Amino acid sequence: ISACLVGSEMCIRDSLTGTPKIKAVKEEEKVAATKEGVLQFETGTMTKEELEAILDTLPVDITFVDKEDSVKYFSKAEKRVFVRTKAIIGRKVQLCHPQKSVHIVNRILDSFKTGKKDVAEFWIQVKDRLIHIRYFAVRDKNGKYLGTMEVSQDITDIKKIEGEKRLLDWKD
C-alpha cells in the first residue's frame, strides 16, 4: 500500500494492483454535498442540524465574536450559565459587558488580534456556583485572526471529583 494523489486529494493505493483503496472525494462531490446541507470538514462531514445539536449538547456555553468584535453565534444549551437572547447577534461585544469591564474585554481582543496571546481565563463565584470562563483566539490555518470564542462552564461539581470512576453505575 502506498499514498497517492488524485487531483489535490490523498488516497491509498494498493502497491500490487495500483488501484485506489479509498476513493478520493472530488471537488464537485464536495460542492454537491454542501448544497445538500452536508458540511465538509477536513476530518469528516455532518449536517448543519447535527453540528448545531452537538454544540447545544456540550456541557459548556459557547459564544463566538468575529474579527470586527460583533457577536455572531451562541450555543443554546438547556442550562446556560449566562443567559443569551438573539438580540445580541450583530451587537458589538463591548456592549454586552458592564462598562467597568470593557477595558479588559478590549485588552483581551487586542492581544488576540495582534497575536500576543491566544487564551484568557477567569473563574468567578455566581451565587453558590464556581464558573470557569475562557476566551480563545480563533485563527485560520495561517494564523490569521478570525475572532474570539468564549467558553463558560459551571465547574462546581467537577471540582468535587476525587479518585476514579471506571464503571458505569446507572440505576435502571
Each language-model region and where it sits:
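Single conserved hydrophobic/aromatic residue that forms the stacking wall/gate
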Residues: 1-7, 11-14
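Short, charged amphipathic alpha-helical "coupling" segments at sensory-output junctions
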Residues: 18-50, 171
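Sensory modules in modular signal-transduction proteins
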Residues: 36-69, 74
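PAS and related sensory helical modules
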Residues: 79-95
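Terminal output helix/cap of sensory domains in signal transduction proteins
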Residues: 96-127
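A short, hydrophobic, proline-anchored segment that marks a local hinge/packing element in signaling
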Residues: 134-139
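Sensory-domain boundary capping and coupling elements
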Residues: 149-152
